[in-house]
């Protein structure tokens, strides 16, 4: 699992270091890479950025949308070597995934050795808990997929309220620690 705190092709299609690193972790010469943009409400520009970067790399890119006519996701996920989850609203993303049983399919993919990765909400989702801004009023801790039995806080160094919020959550024993 590669959890990315922020950045990547969602911010800029010109810096592909993270994307190349992800591909280097796979032993296959031309892996299948699936982008799941659920957290961004399947933002079209985000998906275009994914293809702008990954279609130029040595891989077979594809994406899954849930808010249109949804394909047989099991047949797609089962063929993927790398699954990249985009950023956005973690709470909404996980609710959609659970409705479609994607959470179970991702666990099967993880257990068979697929590389799971993502940025922001796509980083949080793999952990037991994540500190998220899915609620507009404040940061909250939420239960996630629990593939990694820890807590994750993306943007810890990049957003001014993250660090003090994490420290308060630890101090008040809301969480034990945070990665």
What are these regions (language model features)?
Residues 58, 79-80, 113, 148-149, ...:
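Short, well-ordered alpha-helix to beta-strand connector turns
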Residues 26-27, 75-77, 108-109, 144-146, ...:
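Solvent-exposed alpha-helices and their adjacent loops that cap or buttress functional pockets
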Residues 1-7, 149-158, 179:
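Glycine-rich anion-binding loop/nest that anchors nucleotide
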Residues 1-86:
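N-terminal beta1-alpha1 cap of cysteine-dependent amidohydrolase-like domains
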Residues 165-179:
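A conserved acidic, glycine/proline-rich C-terminal tail/linker
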Residues 14-15, 46-47, 98, 162-165:
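Residues at alpha-helix caps and immediate loop-helix transition turns in enzyme cores, especially N-
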